[in-house]
Amino acid sequence: MADKILGNEFTNNKKVKLIAGEVYDNMPYTKKAKSYMTQGELEGKKYGNTYSIYLTDPGEVHDGLEATPDTVTEYAVPVTLKNKNTSVELDAWNKLGDIESFTDEIARPRGRKLARSVEKEVIEDTIPKAFQIVVGSANFKTLTDMSKALDEVSMAGTKVTFVKPTVAGTIANGGLANFTPSEIQSKIYKDAYLGQYAGASVIEDNLMPVVNIAGTETASFAVASVSGNGDESATVVGYNVTGFTGSPNAPYKLEGVKVIGLDGMETDQDFYVIADKDGKIPEVRLAVKGHNVNNANGWVETGSFTPSATLAVESGKYALGQCRDEQAVGFDQYKFSDLPGSENATESVGNVSMKMSTYGDGKYMTTLTRLDLPFACTLPEPRRAVVGYFKI
């Protein structure tokens, strides 16, 4: 029998809390995302506007005893404020006076749909933000290569790998016993959690993209040289990528470019870019070997660098996966102002906050209950993620 809550005990806040819980449970990709903006920074921000978050460089290291202080260099990462909403007529909202009915008819279906809509957008916005890729079959080797690529750039966080359920199933058929269970991660990700492998928690998410590569995709990029200071004022010590054209979701190798690790050290890892749905790539800042300049994320051998990009995969169909620092993705929420004359409630579960507004429409003599999930998402540091192209 349903658990009845009499009188006004089943409040709007409790209803919103139930929905927020459903949303949180159905967003595995976003569950452990990090907040990069404080509520103070978000105060007064408006839907649709683009703002910046700022990250700093690892600084310089010098030989000897003499201290040589350097300036902290920041670089800006743009982030756009978005919103998803769903609404129901007030009668439907109010008529369900017990937890079980409200959960079955309102909280679960609407919470899940809202969650998956937000999750899809977060994935689409952040998956292309990576400077390393791994191409392979749905097997344990590809999972290992993705995880170890993060180790090569000194990524020190907790690693998680997201793949489509069909990819996870194919891999598991090759030896489910290879996955090591983790009670903590199982509680967080629930049924989406497959297990630990190669130092990463493997999570299923059916919204991970599938892309078709024709094999004829081309790309080009342009660079502007950066000169040094003082005695090196006439020397090219780095480059900024000033233009890029390429096909969305196709990975391109930047020839002659290697990744600079998160510790500021030059690595031997090849440098890739993936264009997003708008054809844009993350900011690429290059240093000439041996120079600490420009808060660089990649390096080239000499100051006579000629830019070129080549398609990094053959033609075919690929399911995309991602191995990343668990908190590499940024997920922030901002607040709407209350509508005049409306009743409002806001509740949070995990890193998800939901706002409910009930208001009347005098023109049509109706009353609606509206649920909003305002958010901003990004992956500000592409070196903290690796994208897997699983051939299917």
Task: Show the residue positions of the predicted features.
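Internal mixed-charge
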Residues: R108, G261, A275-A385
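N-terminal "assembly arms/tails" that initiate or stabilize quaternary assembly
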Residues: M1-A76, A385, Y389
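Short helix/loop capping segments that flank catalytic or ligand/cofactor-binding pockets
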Residues: V61-G64, T170-N173, T378-P380
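Short, Lys/Arg-rich flexible segments
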Residues: A2-M37, E89-S101, R110, A115-V134, ...
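Long, contiguous amphipathic alpha-helices that act as assembly "spine/axial" helices in icosahedral shell
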Residues: I53, V77-A138, D151-P165, L254, ...
